[in-house]
UniProtKB/Swiss-Prot annotation:
It comes from Medicago truncatula (Barrel medic). This is Casparian strip membrane protein 4. Residues 1-39 are annotated as: Disordered. Residues 1-60, 130-141, 216-220 are cytoplasmic. Glycans are attached at residue 171. Keywords: Cell membrane, Cell wall biogenesis/degradation, Glycoprotein, Membrane, Transmembrane, Transmembrane helix. The keyword Glycoprotein applies. InterPro entries: CASP/CASPL (IPR006459), CASP_dom (IPR006702), CASPL (IPR044173). Pfam families: CASP_dom.
Amino acid sequence: MDSRREVEESSTAPILESKRTRSNGKGKSIDGDHSPPHAATVVTTKATPLQKGGMKKGIAILDFILRLGAIGAALGAAVIMGTNEQILPFFTQFLQFHAQWDDFPMFKFFVVANGAAAGFLILSLPFSIVCIVRPLAAGPRFLLVIVDLVLMALVVAAASSAAAVVYLAHNGSQDANWNAICQQFTDFCQGSSLAVVASFVASVFLACLVVVSSVALKRT
């Protein structure tokens, strides 16, 4: 009887060991199944800086395009106003009817302000290109925000003062006994109005530049 029990125990021992090895193999396969999610999380964490840099590069390209638009509008406003004059075909022995932009101090300030804004915007183009090449750099973008804010204030002030003169030229002022001159100097008034509109367009471009650069700085 003892020999039979020893034979049965010896025969069942390999079966138990095989079951244990199978269970261990299943455990290893379960651990192996958990490894791909860890690898996926590592890939996602590495991809986030690339997505962030791509977004900033797109913002930098938009900044460059808006900067070109602001240069065109400000330079156009300065050129139109700086070449604006009209001489009426009739004159008397002592008087000639002539209207020119430098007869008004506000128009002089307008030409200087828009010309300076166009010049500084041209000088800022290399910094905008640096932001495209290095989208994560915060120093050049912070400098552009400061310059754009100053230029926006300058252009808005110049456009507002010139708009007041253009309004008086079109409508006059009964209280001050100022007559409207745009009925006689039609071309001069049209040129002045077009320059003022271009200057306000430049100020809108500059405002968009400030917003775009501020958003890019906030995401750094």
